[in-house]
Every structure is written in structure tokens, then in C-alpha cells.
């Protein structure tokens, strides 16, 4: 299916690109989230008329994400979990736990924006974690997992 992108989509294209994607990806993800529209002649003409407005909205989103990223960059979030004597946690620290801690500090972050490259954190220590506030605004924070010894 041919779609026209209404925003930047990772590994696919940028605003205004007409790309061919699988029908299910377009129908179930891109179109419902507002990231794309079917690339009919009418839709392409309508997009060209609104292109400047859409580019302005995208630039504002990016500026807001970068501003939040500047405040968030380099922060250390401390999370305490029950742990054994050897430093392994009973359970794990997930992206939802990190997002909850960031919300407590006043940052508007959802769990889907937290990137844990090696999966959930299962040991005590400090770990670098990426937070993708926008496709072009990714910042690094440090998560300090503190063990509550049982």
C-alpha cells in the first residue's frame, strides 16, 4: 500500500515521503496513529496544500522534545528494589518503573520512550539508559538501582 508520511517514522522516511509499506503495517499502525495517510491523488494534493503547517507543527514538537531533553540529560534516577546478598534483584527494574520515577521528578515520559538495550535491569548498580523523547531527540540518563537487602 502506498502511504504519504505525515511525520518522521524511524526506518521508513520523513514528512512528505510517499512510501510503499505492507497493508497491515499501514492499516494497523501508521494510519491509526496519524503518522500516515493513503497516498491517493486527493490526499497528496491536500498534503501539499498543508505541508508548511505540518512542517511547523513537527518543528514545534522537536523543539519541545529538545527542551525537555536538555533538562533531562545527565539526570540520575534512583530506584530501590528488594535484592539478595549477591546483588541480584528479586524481580527486575523495567522501563515502566523508570518512567514512573521520571514522572515523580516532573518529567512527562511514557514507558515506550525508555530504551533498555539489554532488557530489564536485574542487578544492583548504575546503568546508562536512553530516553527517546522524539525520533531526533534521544538523551542518556543514569539509573541507579539500589538494593534493599532482605
UniProtKB/Swiss-Prot annotation:
GO terms for biological process: translation. Pfam families: Ribosomal_L9_C, Ribosomal_L9_N. GO terms for molecular function: rRNA binding; structural constituent of ribosome. InterPro entries: Ribosomal_bL9, Ribosomal_bL9/RNase_H1_N, Ribosomal_bL9_bac/chp, Ribosomal_bL9_C, Ribosomal_bL9_C_sf, Ribosomal_bL9_N, Ribosomal_bL9_N_sf. SUPFAM superfamilies: L9 N-domain-like, Ribosomal protein L9 C-domain. Signal peptide: none annotated. GO terms for cellular component: ribonucleoprotein complex; ribosome. Keywords: Ribonucleoprotein, Ribosomal protein, RNA-binding, rRNA-binding. Disulfide bonds: none annotated. PANTHER family: 50S RIBOSOMAL PROTEIN L9. Belongs to the bacterial ribosomal protein bL9 family. NCBIfam families: L9 (TIGR00158). Binds to the 23S rRNA. This is Large ribosomal subunit protein bL9. The lineage of its organism: Bacteria, Pseudomonadati, Pseudomonadota, Betaproteobacteria, Burkholderiales.
Amino acid at each position: 500500500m502506498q502511504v504519504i508520511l505525515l511525520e518522521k517514522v524511524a526506518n521508513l522516511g520523513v514528512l512528505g515521503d510517499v512510501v510503499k509499506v505492507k497493508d497491515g503495517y499501514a492499516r494497523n499502525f501508521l494510519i491509526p496513529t496519524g503518522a500516515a495517510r493513503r497516498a491517493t491523488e486527493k490526499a497528496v494534493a491536500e498534503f501539499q496544500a498543508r505541508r508548511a503547517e505540518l512542517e511547523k507543527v513537527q518543528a514545534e514538537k522537536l523543539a519541545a522534545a529538545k527542551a525537555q531533553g536538555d533538562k533531562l540529560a545527565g539526570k540520575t534516577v534512583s530506584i530501590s528494589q528488594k535484592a539478595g546478598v549477591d546483588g541480584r534483584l528479586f524481580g527486575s527494574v523495567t522501563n515502566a518503573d523508570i518512567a514512573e520515577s521520571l514522572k515523580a521528578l516532573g518529567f512527562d515520559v511514557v514507558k515506550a520512550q525508555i530504551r533498555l538495550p539489554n532488557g530489564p535491569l536485574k542487578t544492583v548498580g548504575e546503568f546508562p539508559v536512553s530516553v527517546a523523547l522524539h525520533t531526533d531527540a534521544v538523551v542518556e540518563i543514569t539509573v541507579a538501582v539500589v538494593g534493599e537487602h532482605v
